[in-house]
C-alpha cells in the first residue's frame, strides 16, 4: 500500500509540474517546475527507483530546458533572476545627500568600550615605566598633565621666566590617546619663553582658563597628516592647539621656540585665524590640512630628477618649493617667445644626444649646455640625436666569408679601406686611404652587404643613410643635416658613411633642379672633400648604385675608387646554394648542385636566394591541405632536385643583357677594376 501511495503522490506532483510547464504561464513558475523535476529525478535515483542511465538522460533533458530559461536574455522566454529583486529593494530607498557625513569619527572610536579598555591598559603599563626625571609630563591613571606655562606678555622678564605652580597645573588635566602620551614622553619638556616683553604688544592669555577645552591633536615634529586616514596610528597626532585662542601672537615668535617646534607648529599657534579653523575642524569633521606636500612644477620636478640622476648635492633651500610663486612650466612668465620646459627630458645621457652634456634645469636659466666636443657646438641637439639614433646602423656583424664571389673587389677593399683603418700609423701620406668608394653594378649582387662588412671588419662606426633621411620640408634643414652627419662622424672616427642608391642623392646637377636639392649636393661635396676637410680624417664614404651614369661629375671625382660588382660567377653561385641549403634539410648530390649552377647562369645573388627559397617550398606544396595542420616538422621531406626544377619555371633572371652591357662599358670608361 505504501508503494502504491508513494507512486500516486509522485505521479500527482509530476502531473502538476508538467501542467505548469506546458501551460502558457510566465517563465518563473516554469523554471520552478523544471527545478522540481530535477529534484524528483535525483531523489528517485538516490532511492534506486530508477536506473543511473535513466536518471542521467532525464537530468540532462530537464537541465537543458531549465538552463534555456535561466540563461536566456529574451524578455519573453527568459527569466531575469536579479533585476526584479534589486529594483524592489532599491525602489523605496531615498538617495543620500551630498552633505552626508559618516557617523564613524575619531571621537566615536575613542568612546567605544573596547578602545577604552585598551587605553586604560596602556596607561597602567606607561605608569609603571615612567621615570622620575620626566617631571614635565605626569601620567595618572585617569589623566595626563602638561606643564604649560602661564604666559604674561606684558610682564617683566622675571615674570616671563617663572613657571606656574605644578600643584596648580595638576588640576588642569586632559585625556589623550596612548600614542600621544608615548611621543610626548619622548619629546620631554619644551624650552621656556624668556624676555618677551620687549618685542611683543600688550597681550595676556592664561592657559588655566582653557583647561577644560578640548585640544586638537597634531604632530609636534614633521608634517601634519590628514585626519580621515584608515590607520588609527596615523590619525592620532601629538601637537597641541588651543581651541579658543592663541598663546602667542604673530609678532612674538621666539627663534628658539620656532626652531624647536618647527614652522608648522609656530604658524598654527601664532595665527588666530588658523587656530580658529583648527577648532572648527574638530567640531565639524575631518578636513584637509594646509601642510600637505606642496605642488611641484614641471621645471622643479625635472631639476630634482637631474639631481638624483647625476648624484649632485641638493642646493635648493626650503624656499625652492614652498617660498616661491608657483607657475606651471618655467619660473618666469611664458609669452610668445617663452620656452616650454618638458617634465621629462628626451636626452638620457651624454652619449645618446651626440656628445651633448645634459644640464639640470636648476643650475641656472642662463647657463647654456656646452657640448663635449667643440666640433658639435654649432649643431642642433635634435639633429645629433636623429643621427645617433636613426641613421647609425647597429646591425649584426658581417664577415667576408658571407659574401660569395667578387674576390677582386674584396681584395681591393681590404687593401685601401680595412688595413689603413686598422693600422693608421703605417698607411700615412700617399698610402692614406681614399675619401670615397663607389660600388656599382646590377642590383642584387651584394653591394650593401660589402658596405656593412667594411664597417664590421674595420671596427668603424657605420652610418647608413639615404636621400630621405637628409631631406626636409623646411628650407635649409637638409644641408644642416649633412653638416651634422659629417661632424658626428668626425667625432666617431674611424667612421664609414654608407649611402645606398647614391644616384638619388648625388645625381647630375641641371638647370631645372630644385634649389634645396642643389644645396644639399653642394654641402655634401664640400664636406666630402673641400677646403675645411682634413687629410687626417678617417672617414670613408661608400656609395652603392645600379645607375652609375646618373652620378654627378664632381661626386664621381671624389669617389676615387669605383669598383664594379658583377653578377656572381659559377663558383660564387655554388657557394650561395651550399650556404643556403646547409641550413635546411636537403638531399642534393654534387652532380645535382652542378646542374643547378649551370642552369642559373645570369642569376644575381638575390635571384639565387629567391631560387633556393622557392625550392624550399616544394616539400610543403606536395602535402595535402588537411595534413598541414597535423604534420610535424620532422615529417616534412627533404628538399630534392625536383623542387629546383619546379623553381626554375617561376624564377627568372632580374638583370637584362642590355643592362649588363651598360655596366661593362661604364666600368671600362670610369671603373678601377680589371
From Swiss-Prot:
Catalytic activity of the protein: ATP + H2O = ADP + phosphate + H(+)
Enzyme class, UniProt record, top EC level: hydrolase
CDD domains the record matches: RecA-like_Figl-1
Top-rank lineage group of the source organism: Eukaryota
E.C. numbers: 3.6.4.-
Region (Necessary and sufficient for interaction with RAD51): 295-344
Location of N6-acetyllysine modifications: 339
Example GO molecular function: hydrolase activity
UniProt KW keywords: Acetylation, ATP-binding, Cytoplasm, Hydrolase, Isopeptide bond, Magnesium, Metal-binding, Nucleotide-binding, Nucleus, Phosphoprotein, Ubl conjugation
Binding site residues for ATP: 404, 444-449
Compositional bias annotation for Basic and acidic residues: 167-179
Pfam entry (one): AAA
Required co-factors: Mg(2+)
GO CC term, one of those recorded: nucleus
Annotated positions of the Phosphoserine modification: 259
Location relative to the cell: Nucleus; Cytoplasm; Cytoplasm, Perinuclear region
Function field: Involved in DNA double-strand break (DBS) repair via homologous recombination (HR). Recruited at DSB sites independently of BRCA2, RAD51 and RAD51 paralogs in a H2AX-dependent manner. May regulate osteoblast proliferation and differentiation. May play a role in the control of male meiosis dynamic.
Annotated protein name in UniProt: Fidgetin-like protein 1
Amino acid at each position: 500500500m505504501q508503494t502504491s501511495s508513494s507512486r500516486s503522490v509522485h505521479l500527482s506532483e509530476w502531473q502538476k509540474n508538467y501542467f505548469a510547464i506546458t501551460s502558457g504561464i510566465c517563465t518563473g513558475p516554469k523554471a520552478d517546475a523544471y527545478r522540481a523535476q530535477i529534484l524528483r529525478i535525483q531523489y528517485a535515483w538516490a532511492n534506486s527507483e530508477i536506473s543511473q542511465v535513466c536518471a542521467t538522460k532525464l537530468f540532462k533533458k530537464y537541465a537543458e530546458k531549465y538552463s534555456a530559461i535561466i540563461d536566456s536574455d529574451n524578455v519573453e522566454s527568459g527569466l531575469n533572476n536579479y533585476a526584479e529583486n534589486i529594483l524592489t529593494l532599491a525602489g523605496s530607498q531615498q538617495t543620500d545627500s551630498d552633505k552626508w557625513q559618516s557617523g564613524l569619527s575619531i571621537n566615536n572610536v575613542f568612546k567605544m568600550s573596547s578602545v577604552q579598555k585598551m587605553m586604560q591598559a596602556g596607561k597602567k603599563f606607561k605608569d609603571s615605566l615612567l621615570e622620575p626625571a620626566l617631571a614635565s609630563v605626569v601620567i595618572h591613571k585617569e589623566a595626563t598633565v602638561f606643564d604649560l606655562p602661564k604666559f604674561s606678555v606684558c610682564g617683566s622678564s622675571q615674570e616671563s621666566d617663572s613657571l606656574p605652580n605644578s600643584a596648580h597645573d595638576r588640576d588642569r588635566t586632559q585625556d589623550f590617546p596612548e600614542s600621544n602620551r608615548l611621543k610626548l614622553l619622548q619629546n620631554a619638556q619644551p624650552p621656556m619663553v624668556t624676555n618677551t616683553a620687549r618685542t611683543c604688544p600688550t597681550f595676556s592669555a592664561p592657559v588655566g582658563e582653557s583647561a577644560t577645552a578640548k585640544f586638537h591633536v597634531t604632530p609636534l615634529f614633521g608634517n601634519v597628516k590628514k585626519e580621515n586616514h584608515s590607520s588609527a596610528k596615523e590619525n592620532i597626532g601629538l601637537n597641541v592647539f588651543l581651541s579658543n585662542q592663541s598663546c602667542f601672537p604673530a609678532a612674538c615668535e621666539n627663534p628658539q621656540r620656532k626652531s624647536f617646534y618647527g614652522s608648522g607648529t609656530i604658524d598654527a599657534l601664532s595665527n588666530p585665524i588658523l587656530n580658529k579653523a583648527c577648532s572648527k575642524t574638530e567640531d565639524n569633521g575631518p578636513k584637509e590640512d594646509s601642510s600637505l606636500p606642496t605642488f611641484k612644477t614641471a621645471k622643479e620636478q625635472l631639476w630634482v630628477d637631474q639631481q638624483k640622476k647625476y648624484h649632485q648635492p641638493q642646493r635648493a633651500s626650503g624656499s625652492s618649493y614652498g617660498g616661491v610663486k608657483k607657475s606651471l612650466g618655467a619660473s618666469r612668465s611664458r609669452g610668445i617667445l617663452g620656452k616650454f620646459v618638458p617634465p621629462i627630458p628626451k636626452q638620457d645621457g651624454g652619449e645618446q644626444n651626440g656628445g651633448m652634456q645634459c644640464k639640470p634645469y636648476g643650475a641656472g636659466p642662463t647657463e647654456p649646455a656646452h657640448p663635449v666636443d667643440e666640433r658639435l657646438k654649432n649643431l642642433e641637439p635634435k639633429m645629433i640625436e636623429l643621427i645617433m639614433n636613426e641613421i647609425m646602423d647597429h646591425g649584426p656583424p658581417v664577415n667576408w666569408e658571407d659574401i660569395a664571389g667578387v674576390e677582386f673587389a674584396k681584395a681591393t677593399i681590404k687593401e685601401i679601406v680595412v688595413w689603413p683603418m686598422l693600422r693608421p700609423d703605417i698607411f700615412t701620406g700617399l698610402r692614406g686611404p681614399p675619401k670615397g668608394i663607389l660600388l656599382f653594378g646590377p642590383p642584387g649582387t651584394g653591394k650593401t652587404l660589402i658596405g656593412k662588412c667594411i664597417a664590421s671588419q674595420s671596427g668603424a662606426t657605420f652610418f647608413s643613410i639615404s636621400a630621405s633621411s637628409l631631406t626636409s620640408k623646411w628650407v635649409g634643414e637638409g644641408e644642416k643635416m649633412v653638416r651634422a652627419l659629417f661632424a658626428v662622424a668626425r667625432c666617431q672616427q674611424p667612421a664609414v658613411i654608407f649611402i645606398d642608391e647614391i644616384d638619388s642623392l648625388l645625381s647630375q646637377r641641371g638647370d631645372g633642379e630644385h634649389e634645396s636639392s642643389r644645396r644639399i649636393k653642394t654641402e655634401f661635396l664640400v664636406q666630402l672633400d673641400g677646403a675645411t676637410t682634413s687629410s687626417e680624417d678617417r672617414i670613408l664614404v661608400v656609395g652603392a648604385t645600379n645607375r652609375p651614369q646618373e652620378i654627378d661629375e664632381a661626386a664621381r671625382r671624389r669617389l676615387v675608387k669605383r669598383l664594379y660588382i658583377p653578377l656572381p660567377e659559377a663558383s660564387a653561385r655554388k657557394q650561395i646554394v651550399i650556404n643556403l641549403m646547409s641550413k635546411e634539410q636537403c638531399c642534393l648530390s654534387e652532380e645535382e648542385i652542378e646542374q643547378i649552377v649551370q642552369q642559373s647562369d645570369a642569376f644575381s645573388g638575390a635571384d639565387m636566394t629567391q631560387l633556393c627559397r622557392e625550392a624550399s617550398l616544394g616539400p610543403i606544396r606536395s602535402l595535402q591541405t588537411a595534413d598541414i595542420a597535423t604534420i610535424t616538422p620532422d615529417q616534412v621531406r627533404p628538399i630534392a632536385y625536383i623542387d629546383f626544377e619546379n623553381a626554375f619555371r617561376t624564377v627568372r633572371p632580374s638583370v637584362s643583357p642590355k643592362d649588363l652591357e651598360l655596366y661593362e662599358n661604364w666600368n671600362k670608361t670610369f671603373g678601377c677594376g680589371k
